[in-house]
């Protein structure tokens, strides 16, 4: 299957790309960095050198790639977390990707006649209430410290689920593992980066339009739906 992967050089993208290739998919990895494009080509995948905010160029690249599936794993967060001030500066940038970058990706996917759109969201945005949270529970989009992040995620999900394409939202927990900020879980709900990539591979051919919690079981968030409909395994690891 032909897949257009936005965010191919990010924390998930670096673990996800070889899994997609191993599964027999043809991957076009999107990046705005020429050096990253060279690295993707050396990894054996096609590349699209384009900025998500350049709507016309993105549409051209997407149509040229002619993907059956578009996967949105883009974020704008620091690669190395040195202090909390970095996050305060990054949140608005990340929200812009979720709001405006998503809109451009959806428009490009529609122009390319893609048949499925997969996007990463967050499983740590539920409003306080009974646990474990299911996908039907409301998100905490009220004013407060998390309003920018969760509000943008909620809008992104709405865009995907109302696009007219089959859309799958993967709500990830806090990442840990290779290429992330932490070697082990530090906050709940957590998810190993390999597990997040594993879920994305499953979503290429499984599941139905809607949301799926992708976390490790700790009693805060339910993964029953992902287990049942995706065949999700929260213990999955890439070796090495």
Could you tell me what each predicted segment is?
Residues 3-26:
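N-terminal Rossmann NAD(P)H-binding glycine-rich loop of SDR-like oxidoreductase domains
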Residues 28, 48, 168:
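Conserved beta-strand positions in the Rossmann-like core of class I SAM-dependent methyltransferases
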Residues 32-41, 45-100:
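NAD(P)H-binding glycine-rich loop region in Rossmannoid oxidoreductase-like domains
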Residues 46, 50, 55, 205, ...:
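C-terminal amphipathic/interface module of NAD(P)-dependent oxidoreductases
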Residues 81-144:
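Conserved Rossmann-fold NAD(P)-dependent oxidoreductase catalytic core, especially the SDR/UDP-sugar
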Residues 101-105, 109, 156, 160, ...:
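Hydrophobic positions on the long internal alpha-helix
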Residues 116, 120-124, 142, 155-178:
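Conserved beta-loop-beta element that borders a ligand/cofactor-binding pocket
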Residues 175-179, 187-212, 216-217, 228:
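Alpha-helical substrate-binding/gating segment
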């Amino acid at each position: 299957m032909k897949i257009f992967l936005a965010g191919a050089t990010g924390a998930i993208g670096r673990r996800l790309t070889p899994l997609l290739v191993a599964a027999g998919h043809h991957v076009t990895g999107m990046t705005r960095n020429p050096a990253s494009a060279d690295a993707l080509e050396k990894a054996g995948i096609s590349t699209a050198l384009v900025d998500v905010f350049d709507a016309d160029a993105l549409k051209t690249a997407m149509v040229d790639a002619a993907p059956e599936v578009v996967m949105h794993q883009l974020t704008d967060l620091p690669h190395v977390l040195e202090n909390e001030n970095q996050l305060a500066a990054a949140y608005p940038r990340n929200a812009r990707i979720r709001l405006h970058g998503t809109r451009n990706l959806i428009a490009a996917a529609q122009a390319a006649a893609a048949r499925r759109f997969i996007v990463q969201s967050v499983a740590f945005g539920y409003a306080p209430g009974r646990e474990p949270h299911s996908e039907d529970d409301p998100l905490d989009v009220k004013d407060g410290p998390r309003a920018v992040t969760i509000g943008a995620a909620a809008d992104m999900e709405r865009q995907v689920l109302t696009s007219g394409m089959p859309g799958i939202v993967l709500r990830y927990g806090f990442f840990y593992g290779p290429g992330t900020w932490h070697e082990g879980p530090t906050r709940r709900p957590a998810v190993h980066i390999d597990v997040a990539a594993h879920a994305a591979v499953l979503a290429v051919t499984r599941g139905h339009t809607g949301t799926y919690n992708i976390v490790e079981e700790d009693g805060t968030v339910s993964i029953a739906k992902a287990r049942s409909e995706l065949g999700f395994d929260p213990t999955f690891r890439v070796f090495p």
